[in-house]
Amino acid sequence: MAQDVLTDLKKVRNIGIMAHIDAGKTTTTERILFYTGVNYKIGETHDGASTTDWMEQEQERGITITSAAVTCFWNQNQINIIDTPGHVDFTVEVERSLRVLDGAVAVFDGKEGVEPQSEQVWRQADKYDVPRICFVNKMDKLGADFYFTVQTIKDRLGARPLVIQLPIGAEDTFEGVVDLVEMNAKVWTGETKLGEKYEVKEIPADLAEKAEQYRQELLEAVAESDEALLDKFFGGEELTIDEIKGAIRKMTVNSEAYPVLCGSAFKNKGVQPMLDAVIDYLPSPLDVENVEGHVPGKEDEVINRRPSADEPFAALAFKIAVHPFFGKLTYIRVYSGKVDSGAQVINATKGKKERLGKLFQMHANKENPVPEVSAGHIYAVIGLKDTTTGDTLCDPQNQIVLESMTFPDPVIEVSIEPKTKSDQEKLGTAIQKLAEEDPTFSVKLDPETGQTVIGGMGELHLDILVDRMKREFKVEANVGKPQVAYRETITKTVEKLEYTHKKQTGGSGQFAKVIIALEPFVGEDGAHYEFENKVTGGRVPKEYIPSVDAGAQDAMQYGVLAGYPLVNLKVTLLDGAYHDVDSSEMAFKIAGAQALKEAARKAGPVILEPMMAVEVITPEDYMGDVIGDLNSRRGQIQAMEERSGARVVKALVPLSEMFGYIGDLRSKTQGRANYSMVFDSYAEVPANVSKEIIAKATGE
């Protein structure tokens, strides 16, 4: 059976489940695995037994951190699911999984509607143009409102929802759904506690009118999408179920509309029809545009690959995980071709040969060995030495580099000091392994204190990384307080700065002269730095020019005000001079570094701080206190709105002012308000704050 599917890509779906942190995403995934026969016991996030939450910490905290890839079968179709985390500190995991998906199920909380994090994940899915269906979950919850949630999909996401189901009852009385395509009711009765079976009945009388109204809206949308159906519809003819499904599929695959279904995963209602919708409406690998890449080293030479086993092999590594027995597991999405276990391929991103070891299809953290990998599927590979997230693996004779992924810089750091010499060695191993898995995890040595400093996307992200060092790698260490990852930049242009590096003390000397210009710069793709060479007539020999560039980049690691990394600048090498005997790569590297430092001091240097987009949801009574508190934290209020009886305040607030915020917010609102925050941008700090930061950093 599985082998037949491998050859028929029409029957394959590569999907993700995406949502806000508590919308019930992991529970929904668990139910899918249960109904597709992979799981024999339903795992519950509440009791820490979920299949996809397979790291110890995920089970303790009840949140999904790493996206496990799970394969299951439904009605002769194969579904590969990537479970993505919903907590904002793990957006990199979400980006990574969206890159390799063909479609997604967006899960919403039926009471809360579209929440800040669901909005952010939705925007990321827009970026990768991923077709989606929407599942309004938790319909059994007090205050659940399907129609409100559909409205928030329109209002907050600016998306076009296509309602294809209506709920029967809500809260305690939620018992099933009205299917607007087949015009029947699917009801889960109390007899099958686990919801494996449901009854197909007539639509309840009290819903008949509403069902007819929504059915009409659905048919109009369907007819508008296809001229032949439009003629038929206005000619008074009935559209067949297949015609309706075909039109919905076309609209979904083209991201013109998003089918909306509902249910309660926790109460085992509505999951099977959602699985049917995954098959009916989300794209197979054949429906997605051919993957695009370029010739290694030649970005303007574009190559396309079809999702076919006959094409040359090309795959993207999208996740690294450390497995307790096998060591490093690399998750890959194969876009074209097929290749056997043991085959030699090339990592075209790094230009290095790799041999594919054992190949698996994964079921959370259980493995199913396979003899080969083939286009359109997701696998885990053992034995890749140099491959990291975002690298392309391909046929050595037909090389291609697929588009890579860009990851944000860390915004928060902590120092970590091993307790003993043996801990120091373990820390080295832990850092290397964790950095392989997570491109948003950064490591550096503080030159003043000699301490190791690690950086990440938020407090929870760093907590979990430190926790993993202690648990998985048995590192005993003292961890400092979280610190903000400030940056430095320049505000003025320095048109000409001359620097000569000269050392002549017996033996061979050192000589290098450079003249540079320095100006503020931000690249289109968010790049922080650019180097341009304008030297003519060999006044600086060609072989020394990369050294000037390297020196400038080295100097950017430690800024001129408080030692924070310098960003957003362009260096132009205008002129220079060299000496036949005393010039060297090292001399020009030193000259490049010193010239950059001197120019930066004259270019109006300033300190930048990470600004967070904060959203507070509070009862009306505490609105004044919440706004006053945000203002006292240097917050800029961006918007205020009403949401399901509460008030929502949106603000931009410096990260440095947000430490310990949850405690203050709870005491001000008697525990009734909550908040979420995501990194927004870097902004210049006010002069008085800048003075404090510099004084603290320089110890003055």
UniProtKB/Swiss-Prot annotation:
Similarity remark: Belongs to the TRAFAC class translation factor GTPase superfamily. Classic translation factor GTPase family. EF-G/EF-2 subfamily.
UniProt domain tr-type G: residue ranges: 10-286
Keywords: Cytoplasm, Elongation factor, GTP-binding, Nucleotide-binding, Protein biosynthesis
The keyword Nucleotide-binding belongs to this UniProt entry's keyword annotation: yes
HAMAP family the record matches: EF_G_EF_2_B
MF terms (GO), sorted A to Z: GTP binding; GTPase activity; translation elongation factor activity
Protein purpose: Catalyzes the GTP-dependent ribosomal translocation step during translation elongation. During this step, the ribosome changes from the pre-translocational (PRE) to the post-translocational (POST) state as the newly formed A-site-bound peptidyl-tRNA and P-site-bound deacylated tRNA move to the P and E sites, respectively. Catalyzes the coordinated movement of the two tRNA molecules, the mRNA and conformational changes in the ribosome.
Primary gene name: fusA
Location of the protein in the cell: Cytoplasm
Main location: cytoplasm
Name assigned to this protein: Elongation factor G
Residues bound to GTP: 19-26, 83-87, 137-140
UniProt KW Magnesium keyword: no
